[in-house]
């Protein structure tokens, strides 16, 4: 996929594309067999022991994305939920888990509404001094239970939706991000115009919808918990210079 954005002349871009890519003959791609994941029937856990200074927790729940959702609004409600939990200094994680309860030194929540297949709503964090991974895990579950039983207030909902929309709009100030978003949407089989409709989709989300997705998807049957157990660090051993740091 080639995406060109910025202060360019479309006719010139098209001519250059024809010049450099036109002579290339199309190839017949092999048909990709459907990747069907075995349905998860219960909570999955894994532990990784590795040289590290601090323990680390990751919790992931399987959730739908725009391309796979039966209810179109659900992925957008999950984006709003991520903002409620981790949307700046006034978010619930920052206010309650870090400052008030002091159970986490750092914690984040992330959802991706745009991908080819179902994705994972991820919460990750590091315990505060004197606290354990289990303490953080329980504090996270308590926050999710609160959202399941108590709808967010209209004031909090509006504040978070404004933040989510502002973040998506400000990112488009970057020419690189514009190209990345347009290319990503087309590559996963979605309409690039979803970039423009995203703010309206977020604005339409209600407190009841946020509560519904929390109740529907944040269950043990769709949960995977991973814990990094720190082991003594050998300072004489060179650290890896590449790769996924979460897999070490």
Describe these PLM feature segments.
Residues 1, 118-122, 195:
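Short, solvent-exposed beta-strand edge segments and adjacent coil->beta transition regions
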Residues 1-20, 222:
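Non-catalytic, conformational "gating/processing" segments within enzyme and secreted inhibitor domains
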Residues 10-14, 133-134, 223, 235-238:
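Extracytoplasmic/secreted cell-surface and envelope-processing proteins
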Residues 15, 69-74, 132-136:
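Solvent-exposed, non-transmembrane alpha-helical starts
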Residues 19-28, 141-152:
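A common structural junction motif
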Residues 23-68, 83-132, 155-166, 173, ...:
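Non-catalytic beta-strand/loop surface segments
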């Amino acid at each position: 996929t080639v995406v060109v954005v910025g202060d360019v002349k479309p006719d010139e871009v098209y001519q250059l594309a024809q010049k450099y890519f036109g002579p290339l003959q199309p190839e017949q791609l092999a048909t990709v067999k459907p990747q069907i994941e075995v349905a998860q029937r219960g909570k999955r856990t894994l532990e990784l022991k590795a040289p590290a200074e601090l323990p680390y927790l990751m919790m992931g729940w399987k959730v739908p994305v725009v391309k796979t959702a039966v209810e179109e609004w659900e992925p957008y409600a999950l984006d709003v939920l991520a903002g409620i939990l981790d949307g700046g200094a006034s978010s619930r994680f920052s206010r309650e888990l870090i400052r008030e309860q002091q159970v986490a030194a750092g914690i984040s929540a992330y959802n991706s509404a745009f991908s080819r297949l179902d994705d994972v709503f991820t919460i990750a964090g590091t315990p505060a001094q004197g606290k354990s991974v289990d303490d953080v895990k329980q504090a996270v579950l308590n926050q999710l239970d609160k959202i399941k039983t108590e709808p967010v207030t209209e004031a909090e909902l509006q504040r978070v939706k404004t933040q989510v929309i502002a973040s998506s709009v400000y990112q488009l100030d970057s020419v690189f991000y514009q190209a990345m978003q347009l290319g990503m949407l087309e590559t996963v089989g979605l309409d690039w115009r979803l970039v423009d409709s995203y703010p309206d989709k977020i604005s339409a989300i209600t407190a009841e919808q946020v509560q519904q997705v929390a109740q529907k998807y944040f269950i043990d049957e769709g949960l995977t918990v991973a814990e990094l157990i720190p082991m003594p660090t050998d300072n004489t051993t060179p650290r890896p210079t590449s790769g996924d740091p979460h897999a070490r």
